[in-house]
Regions:
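Multi-pass alpha-helical transmembrane bundle typical of ion/small-solute transporters
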Residues: 1-324
Length: 324
């Protein structure tokens, strides 16, 4: 059982990095601040530093604040991972801008409810997590809008060389977002794997073991270094035709929101925050040139992901019980 828990947690970490990396590097690639391979590798390096510098508060949230740990069996944790992983693979192949956080929360809820009923849910923690998931994209949109609006007005008389400076600042903002993303998203896999280890009696407390941190972070960064090229094209040009000012504004907005969530232990969707930040950055210049249909896709993902993974994990748990 431990081998299955480790394998699925690492796969989840890998697809998490694969799904979210386009959101981080798309602005710098589309504005020619960095080449694609260079951007992905630098982002992966920043992500590796994130949990080491900023901590793993999100892991504690995943392991102890959504469902009652004592209500979870090893099979239940396994079912939650299977559901989150299957949903991540499905949405990656279809291009739906979903969230691995939504998927994991839904998976944990479904497995806990199937195991012990409603009493297995920790309502305050659940409300906190869902609140962070819901409020973070609008915050990204608002900060992206305000950042670009302010920059455009301050730079009206600027020389054309301002674009070169903005490209350099974009690289710094990308690294900040990468580190924040590493502290926000990599601990999700660490938290669920730690929960699984506790359920099988492999450890007593919920502190993340060093080998769990290193392995989950390694697979997470590996997924990032490969990147999702289709998502990069969508975020880099299909939402709005980005220039350096938009890329910089969106990256700063994303870094602020994701860093805040990571420090507070709130698991959010970096890809949805960045898509919203790009929408806001574009809207600050030309409202009618923004492709607002991406909001429809995001709302669809919001509505579908938690219910779908909840039902899926409950179904997987029932199958595992029958196979036992």
């Amino acid at each position: 059982m431990i081998a299955w828990l480790v394998a699925l947690a690492l796969l989840y970490a890998f697809f998490n990095g694969l799904n979210d990396s386009p959101a981080i590097v798309a602005p710098v690639i589309s504005t020619h601040a960095l080449g694609s391979r260079q951007a992905l590798l630098l982002t992966a390096a920043a992500q590796a530093a994130g949990p080491l510098v900023l901590g793993t508060a999100v892991a504690t949230t995943i392991a102890t604040r959504i469902v009652r740990p004592e209500s979870m069996s090893a099979q239940a944790v396994l079912a939650a991972l299977v559901a989150a992983l299957l949903w991540s693979v499905l949405t990656w192949t279809t291009g739906l801008p979903t969230s691995s956080s939504h998927a994991l929360v839904g998976g944990l809820m479904g497995a806990a409810l199937a195991s012990a009923g409603p009493r297995a849910l920790l309502l305050p923690g659940f409300v906190r997590v869902v609140g962070a998931l819901v409020i973070s994209p609008p915050l990204g949109l608002l900060i992206g809008y305000l950042g670009v609006w302010l920059t455009l007005r301050l730079a009206r008389q600027a020389k054309p060389t301002l674009n070169n400076r903005l490209r350099r600042w974009q690289r710094v903002a990308m690294l900040a977002l990468g580190a924040s993303h590493g502290a926000s998203d990599a601990p999700k896999a660490m938290g669920v794997l730690t929960l699984g280890l506790v359920t099988v009696g492999a450890q007593q407390g919920f502190g993340v073991p060093v080998w769990v941190l290193a392995s989950c972070l390694g697979f997470f960064c590996l997924g990032t270094s490969i990147g999702g090229w289709r998502q990069m094209r969508r975020l880099g040009g299909q939402i709005y035709r980005l220039r350096p000012v938009h890329g910089f504004g969106a990256l700063v907005a994303g870094a602020l929101v994701v860093l805040s969530a990571a420090m507070l232990g709130g698991p959010i969707s970096t890809s949805q925050v960045m898509a919203s930040a790009i929408l806001g950055a574009g809207a600050a210049e030309r409202l009618n040139k923004v492709r607002w249909l991406i909001l429809r896709d995001m709302l669809t993902a919001w509505v579908l992901t938690i219910p779908a993974t909840l039902l899926l994990s409950a179904g997987v748990l029932e199958v595992l019980r029958r196979l036992q």
